Amino acid sequence: TNAQDGVSSVQTAEGALTEVHSMLQRMNELAVQAANGTNAESDRQAIQDEIDQLTTEIDRVAETTKFNEIYLLKGDKGTKTINLEAHDAGLKGTLTNNGDGTATFTMDAIKTGDKVAIGGKTYTIGSTVDEAKALIKAPATGTVDVQIGDKTFKIDNTGKVMDADGNQLYVETKDGQTAAATFSATSNLTTTQKFNNDQGVATDNRAVSVDNLKSYVKGGVTVKVGTESATAMTDVAGAADGVDDNDVTLITKQKAYELAGKELLAANSIGDTEGHASVKNGDDTDLAFDKGDGSFKINVAQAKVANTLSFNLHVGSDADLTNKIQVNIDTMNSDFLGIKGLNVKDENGSAATYAVDAIADAVAKVSSQRSALGAVQNRLEHTIDNLDNVVENT
C-alpha cells in the first residue's frame, strides 16, 4: 500500500541518518582528542585525515541515498542560504542570537589583575604604572593591607603608613639632618626600610607618606591593596601593542578584547562557505588592541544548500486531502550540517575545541530530522493498522 511504501521510504532515510549520526559521533571523539595539548603535529594530521574522510562519506551518503529513484537526503531543486549557529569561543559572557544572521556577545566584566582565558591561553590584565599607583590610598575606615612587590605595609584611614606589624614608618636621613631639609618626597625609599624616630626630629616631617609608598611602583611590579590588585606593565604608555615587554601573558584590557574578538571570529567561521562570518566591536569599529569595550557584533557563518525535499504520501482510498501525509527532509550534507572544511590542526587545540561545538550543532540537526522522520513513521504505522481494521470490518 501507499502507507507501507511511505514507511519504507522513511525507514530508508532514517537508516542512512543513523550512519551519519554515528560518523558525527566519531568526529566528535576525534575533535576532543585533537583538543588535547599532548598531541604532536603528526597526531593532529592523522586525526584531520580521518575527519576529512568522514566528512566525505557524509556527503556521499547525502548524495546517493534514495528510495524508488527518489534521492532522500540531497534536498530538492533550487538553493537557499542558511545561517549557522553562533558560538562564544569558550569566553565568559552572554551570547544572544538575533535570528537574522547576526549575534551579539558581551564579555563578563574584566578589571586589572583578573585572569582571563582566551583561545586556550590564560592572560593577566595589566595596568599602567599610574593605574597601579592609584590603588595605594588611605581607606575610608580602619586599616588596609598593602603589598608592593615583595614588601608589605599597612595604611590606616588617617593616611598613616605602617609596617606589617603595625609600627609607623619614618624616614631617617643618612647624615642626621632633618627630613624636612633633605628628604625628597618620592625618591629616597630603599628596599629594606627600618624607619625609626630616634633622631629627635619632628615626626610630622619624617613620617612615611602614602605618596612615598607609590614611589615603589614601576613596570613589572604587582600592587595588592585589600582584595584589589594591579600589575604595572613594563611598557608604561599603554603599550605600543597592548602586550607587556617582558611577559607576553600580561596584556591590557583592550588587548584582551582584541584577542577575544579574533577567537570569536575563528569559532564562528566554521562551515562559512559563503564568506559571511565577521566580528566587530559593539560600536561597529574594527578589532584593535587599543579599542573595544567587551561587546561584539557577530555576523554568523552562512552556507548555500539545496531546498528542503517535500513530498506527500496518500494513505486513503478517496481523494480527500486529509488522506495526505507530508514528509519534509532537509539535505544532510556537510554544508547544511555546518562542518564543511572542519579543521582541528592548530597548535594549541583551540580549533579542535571550536570544532566540537560545530559538530554538536550538526548532531542536533541530524537528531531533529531523525525525530521528525520517526514521528511520520509512527503515524504511518497507525494508519496501516487502521486501514487493516477498516478492511477487516467492512
Placement of each model-derived feature along the sequence:
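Primary detection of the long, small/polar-rich alpha-helical "axial" segments characteristic
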Residues: T1-T394
